């Protein structure tokens, strides 16, 4: 239903008024192609719509980044309470493995005084992040950096560091559903036990 409503530019929260509507031939062809790509090719819905949601926040995504699905977003909704006593005291923050930039953006929204460094190894991912940062009008507060973890951050310190790094072990990567095979493996797998990048942090 979501794919249909999104593709036809219909409101996602009001299905009933359109239940008796008839599709035009071009609309039927468009939807048939969409359903084929989703059901036969097993493309993630987020790649078909070029959008993913974390709570009420929409982000652009494509196959250059993994589909955002981090529980950290829920923690940021609460400004990381109880671990952060004074959100206004956070003046600098780092998002390692930023991907689409969604967590960096949510961090900037949660901590209004913070300047963000958003780091990723992938230039492709950073291109997607740049689009999202611009969409949220945060280019003056979120700096995008191509770096392998802390390599290009020597000497820099941060009040807060967040990260949703690759953490899937090799056995689990091999057993993932077909949808995950369309996502960048660099952002999912992290060695035999899934902890290669975590050890770096």
Predicted regions and their residues:
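N-terminal accessory segments
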Residues: 1-46
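Short, solvent-exposed loop/helix junctions and linker helices
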Residues: 24-28, 66-69, 191-195
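Active-site/binding-pocket entry motifs
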Residues: 9, 65-66, 167
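A secondary-structure boundary/capping signal
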Residues: 19, 62-63, 164
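Active-site catalytic microenvironments for nucleophilic, acid-base chemistry
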Residues: 6, 110, 135
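SAM-dependent Rossmann-like transferase core, predominantly class I methyltransferases
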Residues: 29-112, 116, 121-128
């Amino acid at each position: 239903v979501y794919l249909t409503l999104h593709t036809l530019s219909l409101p996602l929260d009001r299905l009933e008024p359109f239940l008796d509507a008839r599709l035009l031939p071009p609309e039927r062809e468009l939807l048939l192609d969409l359903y084929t790509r989703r059901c036969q090719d097993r493309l993630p819905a987020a790649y078909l719509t070029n959008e993913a949601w974390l709570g009420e926040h929409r982000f652009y995504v494509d196959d250059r980044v993994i589909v955002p699905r981090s529980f950290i977003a829920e923690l940021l909704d609460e400004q990381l309470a109880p671990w952060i006593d004074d959100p206004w005291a956070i003046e600098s923050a780092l998002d390692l493995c930023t991907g689409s930039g969604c967590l960096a953006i949510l961090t900037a929204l949660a901590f209004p005084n913070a300047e963000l460094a958003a780091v990723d190894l992938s230039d492709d991912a950073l291109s997607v992040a740049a689009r999202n940062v611009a969409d949220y009008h945060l280019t003056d507060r979120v700096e995008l950096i191509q770096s392998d973890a802390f390599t290009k951050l020597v000497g820099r310190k941060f009040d807060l560091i967040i990260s949703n790094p690759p953490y899937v072990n090799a056995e689990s990567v091999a057993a993932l559903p077909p949808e995950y095979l369309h996502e960048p493996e660099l952002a999912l797998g992290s060695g035999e036990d899934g902890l290669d990048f975590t050890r770096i942090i």
